[in-house]
UniProtKB/Swiss-Prot annotation:
NCBIfam families: unchar_dom_1. The gene is ACOT13. Keywords: Acetylation, Cytoplasm, Cytoskeleton, Hydrolase, Lipid metabolism, Metal-binding, Mitochondrion, Nucleus. One of its GO terms (biological process) is negative regulation of cold-induced thermogenesis. Gene3D superfamilies: Hotdog Thioesterase. This is Acyl-coenzyme A thioesterase 13. The modification N-acetylthreonine is found at residue 2. It is an enzyme of class 3 (hydrolase). Changing residue 56 to A: Decreases affinity for substrate. Catalyzes the hydrolysis of acyl-CoAs into free fatty acids and coenzyme A (CoASH), regulating their respective intracellular levels. Has acyl-CoA thioesterase activity towards medium (C12) and long-chain (C18) fatty acyl-CoA substrates. Can also hydrolyze 3-hydroxyphenylacetyl-CoA and 3,4-dihydroxyphenylacetyl-CoA (in vitro). May play a role in controlling adaptive thermogenesis. It comes from Homo sapiens (Human).
């Protein structure tokens, strides 16, 4: 296990103990971490669903936000930044009990801005559930 992977596992472990909103991410599992790329998995459980039993759109946005930030932490700069813009396109539902894969890539990291892309897919079928783009300000 790389130190990058171990560091992110510590971050996820802290989320499971959080008393704030971050605790909703306590059920994600880190699959791999490489420079500018993070892959996580999560089973859709009842606490993750909306009234019709599918993955809640707000949780999808939270996954895009946080997993893309983890990908930024896995760069040489290692800066999480702050959100400037986030866009999510919802393409198909993830149902209760299904396993999803969340793959985040850093597309470009400049002096002050970083651009990331996140795909949420159904683990069994590979079907695209949602795709997000996240722009973050990295500071000076």
């Amino acid at each position: 296990m790389t130190s990058m992977t171990q560091s992110l596992r510590e971050v996820i472990k802290a989320m499971t103990k959080a008393r704030n909103f971050e605790r909703v991410l306590g059920k994600i599992t880190l699959v791999s971490a490489a420079p500018g790329k993070v892959i996580c998995e999560m089973k859709v459980e009842e606490e993750h669903t909306n009234a019709i039993g599918t993955l809640h759109g707000g949780l999808t946005a939270t996954l895009v936000d946080n997993i893309s930030t983890m990908a930024l932490l896995c760069t040489e700069r290692g800066a999480p930044g702050v959100s400037v813009d986030m866009n999510i396109t919802y393409m198909s539902p993830a149902k209760l009990g299904e396993d999803i894969v969340i793959t985040a890539h850093v597309l470009k990291q400049g002096k002050t801005l970083a651009f990331t892309s996140v795909d949420l897919t159904n683990k069994a079928t590979g079907k695209l559930i949602a795709q997000g783009r996240h722009t973050k300000h990295l500071g000076n």
